[in-house]
Amino acid sequence: MSETSEQDARNLAAQHRELQQNAESVNQQLGMVQMSIEDCTRAILTLEELKSASGAINTMIPLGAGALIHANIADVDKIVVSVGAGISVEKTPTEAIETLTQRKEELGKVVERLNGTLTQIGQRLASIESAVGNRPPQ
C-alpha cells in the first residue's frame, strides 16, 4: 500500500471513529429529551386527573431514594411550573397543562432534529464504509 493510500485509510478510520462518537452523543441526547417528553406526559396526565378530582386528594409524594410521604392536596387551583432559568410561576391547572403541552411539542421538534442528525451521521458512516470497501488492495 502506498504512503498516500495508508494516510487516506488512517484519515477515513479517524473520521469513522469520530462519527461513531458523535452518534453515541446524539443518542444520549435523544434519550434525555425522550425522558423529558415522558415527564411532561406524566405531569399532564396527573394535572388532568387532579383537575377532575373534588375535595381533598390523598396521595403519596416521592421524597427521593425510594422514600414516599403521605399527603393531602387540599387545593389544586394553583400549580407552580418551571419556565426556565430557575424561574417558576403559578398557573391554573389549565394554563399549566398548556405550558407543558407546548414544552412537549418543542421537545418533539428537538427529537426530530436529533433523528435527522443521526440519519446524516449514518449516511456519512455508510459512505466511509463504502469507500473503504471499494478500495482495491494494494
UniProtKB/Swiss-Prot annotation:
Pfam families with a match to the protein in the record: Prefoldin
Any one GO molecular function term: unfolded protein binding
Keywords in alphabetical order: Chaperone, Cytoplasm
Main location: cytoplasm
GO term, biological process aspect, one: protein folding
UniProt KW Cytoplasm keyword: yes
GO cellular component: cytoplasm; prefoldin complex
Subcellular location field: Cytoplasm
The protein's role, per its UniProt record: Molecular chaperone capable of stabilizing a range of proteins. Seems to fulfill an ATP-independent, HSP70-like function in archaeal de novo protein folding.
UniProt similarity note: Belongs to the prefoldin subunit alpha family.
Assembly information from the UniProt record: Heterohexamer of two alpha and four beta subunits.
Protein name according to UniProt: Prefoldin subunit alpha
Originating species: Methanococcoides burtonii (strain DSM 6242 / NBRC 107633 / OCM 468 / ACE-M)
Lineage: Archaea, Methanobacteriati, Methanobacteriota, Stenosarchaea group, Methanomicrobia
